[in-house]
Amino acid sequence: MAKKIAGQLKLQVPAGSATPSPPIGPALGQRGINIMEFCKAFNAQSQDLEKGSPIPVVITYYQDKSFTFTMKTPPVSYFLKKAANLKSGSKEPGKQSAGQISRAKVREIAETKMKDLNANDVEAAMRMVEGSARSMGLEVVG
């Protein structure tokens, strides 16, 4: 018989550095999920990723207090800030430019994020990434 799902939880956890401290500990503890078991499993799976990059994780927990989780790729904004060497986007996107990013970098980001985006081809994924860049105040050149 299949396990009965009790719910889902979405978190953004830095790669390789999941700890029982807030915000992870309280979010998992409230739902009766073994915090240390999650931290060890997450850190083991994310050890080959860039340390500290924010990894969206979807945790499915069951009524018997067990859980499974899936990791996604870091957010588009993380890749854009990294590619443009920015700390944050523009305070007034559309009026004030935060920097520039090449179409080649946009394509690279789109190919990396392709499995998580709701796009059928790379061109559609590129348009989504360009939209994110514009909303951050980045100018797409080339």
UniProtKB/Swiss-Prot annotation:
Posttranslational mods:
One or more lysine residues are methylated.
Keyword RNA-binding present in the record's keywords: the answer is yes
Q: Which domain of life is it from?
A: Bacteria
**GO BP:** translation
Q: Which GO terms describe its cellular component?
A: cytosolic large ribosomal subunit
InterPro entries according to UniProt: Ribosomal_uL11 (IPR000911), Ribosomal_uL11_bac-typ (IPR006519), Ribosomal_uL11_C (IPR020783), Ribosomal_uL11_C_sf (IPR036769), Ribosomal_uL11_CS (IPR020785), Ribosomal_uL11_N (IPR020784), Ribosomal_uL11_N_sf (IPR036796)
Question: SMART domains under this entry?
Answer: RL11 (SM00649)
Listed GO MF terms: large ribosomal subunit rRNA binding; structural constituent of ribosome
One Pfam family, short name? Ribosomal_L11
Keyword list, A-Z: Methylation, Ribonucleoprotein, Ribosomal protein, RNA-binding, rRNA-binding
Q: Which CDD domains does this entry report, sorted A to Z? A: Ribosomal_L11
User: Quick one: where's region Disordered?
Assistant: 86-105
What is the protein's quaternary organization?
Answer: Part of the ribosomal stalk of the 50S ribosomal subunit. Interacts with L10 and the large rRNA to form the base of the stalk. L10 forms an elongated spine to which L12 dimers bind in a sequential fashion forming a multimeric L10(L12)X complex.
Function, as annotated:
Forms part of the ribosomal stalk which helps the ribosome interact with GTP-bound translation factors.
Q: Which NCBIfam families match?
A: L11_bact
Q: What family, per the record? A: Belongs to the universal ribosomal protein uL11 family.
Q: What is this protein called?
A: Large ribosomal subunit protein uL11
Origin organism is Chelativorans sp. (strain BNC1)
Write the gene name: rplK
